[in-house]
Amino acid sequence: MRKIILASGSPRRKELLELAGVPFEIIVSEVEETIGAYSSPSDIVMSLALQKASAVAENNSDHIVLGADTIVTYESRILGKPSNKAEAKEMLQLLSGKTHEVYTGVAIIAKDKTVTFYERTEVTFWELTEEEIDAYVASKEPLDKAGSYGIQGKGSIFVQHIQGDYYSVVGLPISRLVRELKQFNIDVTHA
């Protein structure tokens, strides 16, 4: 039987697959995440997801491999994972009181088929005080997250409004993924 392999070390993606009852194994993709010249954020996340999944699929061609990537954008600026606390603070100041977009791209690769898709979610932050930002950055939570916040953690208190898929902001649009897996004869809704 074909296994599902998650090409990611993200604890959030792992948790979402577990919550949905998707059986899987993890093989972390060692692909260097580089953003080339793309026309849109959706192209970027789908391309990076495909690169990650492809790298793992090379040695696991008998299985189904999932890759995913998430970016945050504000006014055409891409906000990836901050490289340090100062950059995290700068990103949070930029997002304070404003609406930004979160894009998560997913690639599903099997021997006979490849599917890519993305979800776009709008997130609006409350106005943040410097003290709130400093305390959050000091917690180190934002340092491994696109846009410098985790909506499922302490960063949730910054969110005034969300339009779209919450789980996509966490890192994996699990409802859409489960539906797309049906194309690969994987149905976890009856498990």
From Swiss-Prot:
In chain numbering, where does the site feature Important for substrate specificity fall? 12, 70, 152
Q: Which GO terms describe its cellular component?
A: cytoplasm
**Reaction(s) catalysed by this chain's protein:** dTTP + H2O = dTMP + diphosphate + H(+); UTP + H2O = UMP + diphosphate + H(+)
**One of the GO biological process terms:** nucleotide metabolic process
This protein's UniProt keywords: Cytoplasm, Hydrolase, Nucleotide metabolism
Per its UniProt record, what Gene3D superfamilies does this chain match? 3.90.950.10
Major enzyme class: hydrolase
Subcellular location(s): the record lists: Cytoplasm
Main localization of the protein described in the UniProt heading: cytoplasm
Keyword Acetylation belongs to the record: no
Q: Where is the active site?
A: 69
| Pfam families found in the cross-reference section | Maf
> What Enzyme Commission number(s) does the record list for this chain?
3.6.1.9
Cofactor names from the entry are:
a divalent metal cation
Carries keyword Hydrolase?
Answer: yes
Q: Which GO molecular-function terms appear in the entry?
A: dTTP diphosphatase activity; UTP diphosphatase activity
User: In terms of domain of life, where is this protein from?
Assistant: Bacteria
**Protein function:** Nucleoside triphosphate pyrophosphatase that hydrolyzes dTTP and UTP. May have a dual role in cell division arrest and in preventing the incorporation of modified nucleotides into cellular nucleic acids.
Q: Which family does it belong to?
A: Belongs to the Maf family. YhdE subfamily.
**What name has this protein been given in UniProt?**
dTTP/UTP pyrophosphatase
